[in-house]
């Protein structure tokens, strides 16, 4: 049995910092600007700047059904992009799924085949080429060395990789850059939530099992009397995150490590920054660490912005049975969204009642 505790009310989403109500698209754009400044700077340490130079080098070109390889060089820093193209009868320009989790085991033949079978290109890079995922590895490597005066964390560095990969996709003629969706798992899911928030070119955003610092809720904690799929007995907290992965975040988050109730933001604000674009959150019911009820609470709160913009059907929360992984169930749901199918929330009543 799960039980939950709400530490404090979620901060106001549809009020400006000075208390002025947000009532229409114009005032939402102003509020969006406030949130980008407050949340991105505090939670993530800001973002790396847009590069002054960027070039895309073709390393290999193939016919339909093949793999094209590219080197992206941003301000002199290189990383690599592979594009798996669908076979005939699909013809370019292809919509594309952009996936920065080239470092995960989930990027396998079945994953590629499912994307291509539906007529999409799959563009893959390894976010670890941008910044290390090892605690205490320092800031002398990766893109930290490009911008030593900046204080962004690893999540921002990885999200920057998505932005630069999107720059590349816009230059590649067989990609339909107006129909690019991004997905990632766990810390990769946190990454795509950030990338989707700061860059409106991404038409579809899918964080999978992203938990605390992703689609969860800092203010809501869950405890269980039986272990979850990973043996966990409770949801992850900000203290847990900062003890193990402080380098993912901005330094200011340390102030709130044991006082999440006082955070001036929560993850409903990150979700709202996607509006009115499609945001599909995919979660696993036995993934207690990822805080399924917290995800539901911030989802429901973010709906207010989607409703204001006349796009309530574009924010979706889908649960599946199982544990912490990126499976074909979640991928298929995301491709359904990208094909324009309407998916409904499927939050179980027992999750709502925690």
Regions found by a protein language model. Name each.
Residues 163-232, 259-260:
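Primarily recognizes the serine-hydrolase "nucleophile elbow" in alpha/beta-hydrolase
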Residues 92-97, 117-121, 176-179, 200-204, ...:
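Loop/turn elements at helix/coil->beta-strand transitions in domains of secreted/extracellular proteins
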Residues 207-270, 291, 295-299, 307-312:
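Mobile cap/lid helix-loop segments that gate and shape the active-site cleft of serine hydrolases
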Residues 99-171, 214-220:
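Cap/lid segment of the alpha/beta-hydrolase catalytic domain
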Residues 125, 183-185, 207-208, 282-284, ...:
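Generic beta-strand/beta-sheet core signal
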Residues 81, 94, 108-112, 133-137, ...:
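Short, solvent-exposed loop/turn and secondary-structure capping segments
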């Amino acid at each position: 049995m799960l039980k939950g505790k709400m530490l404090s009310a979620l901060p106001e989403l549809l009020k400006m910092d000075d208390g002025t109500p947000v009532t229409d698209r114009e005032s939402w754009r102003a509020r969006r600007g406030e949130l980008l400044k407050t949340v991105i700077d505090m939670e993530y340490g800001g973002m790396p700047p847009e590069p002054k130079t960027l070039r895309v080098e073709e390393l290999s070109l193939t016919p339909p059904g093949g793999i094209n390889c590219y080197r992206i060089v941003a301000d002199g820093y290189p990383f690599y992009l592979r594009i798996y193209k669908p076979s005939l009868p699909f013809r370019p320009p292809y919509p594309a799924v952009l996936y920065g989790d080239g470092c995960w085991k989930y990027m396998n033949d079945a994953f590629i085949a499912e994307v291509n079978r539906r007529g999409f290109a799959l563009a893959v890079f390894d976010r670890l080429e941008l910044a290390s995922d090892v605690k205490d590895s320092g800031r002398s490597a990766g893109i930290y060395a490009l911008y030593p005066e900046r204080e962004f964390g690893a999540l921002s560095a990885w999200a920057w990789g998505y932005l630069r990969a999107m720059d590349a996709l816009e230059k590649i003629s067989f990609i339909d850059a107006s129909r690019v969706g991004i997905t990632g798992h766990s810390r990769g899911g946190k990454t795509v939530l950030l990338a989707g928030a700061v860059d409106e070119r991404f038409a579809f955003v899918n964080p999978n099992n992203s938990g605390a610092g992703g689609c969860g809720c800092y203010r809501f904690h869950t405890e269980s009397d039986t272990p979850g799929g990973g043996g966990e007995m409770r949801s992850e907290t900000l203290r847990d995150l900062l003890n193990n992965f402080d380098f993912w975040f901005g330094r200011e988050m340390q102030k709130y490590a044991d006082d999440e109730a006082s955070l001036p933001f929560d993850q409903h604000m990150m979700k709202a920054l996607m509006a009115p674009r499609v945001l599909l959150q995919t979660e696993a019911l036995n993934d207690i660490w990822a805080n399924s009820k917290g995800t539901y609470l911030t989802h429901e709160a973010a709906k207010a912005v989607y409703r204001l913009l006349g796009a309530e059907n574009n924010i979706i929360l889908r649960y599946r049975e199982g544990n912490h992984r990126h499976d074909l169930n979640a991928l298929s749901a995301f491709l359904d969204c990208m094909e324009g199918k309407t998916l409904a929330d499927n939050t179980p009543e027992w999750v709502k009642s925690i």
